[in-house]
């Protein structure tokens, strides 16, 4: 049935003058953007909402004139940052809030004119920005190295959970009774969620779902719906099981690509009584074979393992994939004629002219990574204009490899039980080490300093 029923080649709603975009709505003049809504002139990005004039951003919202951001919100001219909100005209920030004119900072709140977490006058800060020259790639590498070194000296909150009650996971906003979940907003009484937004209630094992969804189980991508299980890309369905790409339907079982239908099994129409009888027989047979209650088997995936986002979060080699009987797509023999290698690119963006637009640039990884490296890439005109306008160095990696560098800034989608590392006597626990326990996405062997909520608040605010 999956092979016979036509599928939409792309999921695009109200797209205007876009190239290489999918899974979104209201995109205007965007390029290589996957996932999101209400975006204009967003390039090389994924899962972006209500943003414009930005490049290389992921899982971000209300961002403008920014570059290389991950999990950032309400930002203007924010560059090379992650998990930072309400920040303006700043560079290299980690876990900062409401900051302006800050450079290379970690864990700051309500600050201005800070450089690597140290305060400066306005004049000193502006002089530093000029002397540092953000358009230099060598300076960029040095700044990143300094930021990572600083990051290991600063305490980190055990989890990025905001305005939430009785919830655990990471990157949660306004969650209530939500557990072992990640990158989600406005969720309630749910567990094992990933990137679920705007009204998800009583849902388990669900990803990329949102907008008033309830009583869902084992769902991969969709909007709305109630009492559904084992589905892919379904919108506003009710009382349904094992369906794919069905919209506005009720009482479906094992259907593909239906619209506004009711009482269908394997795309065949039944009466209400027939539907219940046949459905129950199928469920009984599936249960006897141990199949009912499980998601679609991976052999039904239309894509190879390394073509999906599974490779982003659970990377495998070809040998590992094949040993698990997963399909694998071999790299294409691209035979690019490389015009320029990264070591031959001028260091400063202002030294680069428009001739670069005609060049095939070798990716610095040269295909030797697990990041779907394209081995070479080109700079598009709008991209070069942006780099020059913002004085940012030319990238040395292809868009795919840049994407993988960004998502590495996310902690694993997994929790460990740990104890607060704080030993400061002036905190609420007094002398000795804090004994507060919590669930955190920071693995025990990681080098970061992890604090409980109270110790973190006392240290940062």
Language model segments and positions:
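Long, distal/terminal scaffolding or interaction modules
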Residues: 1-461
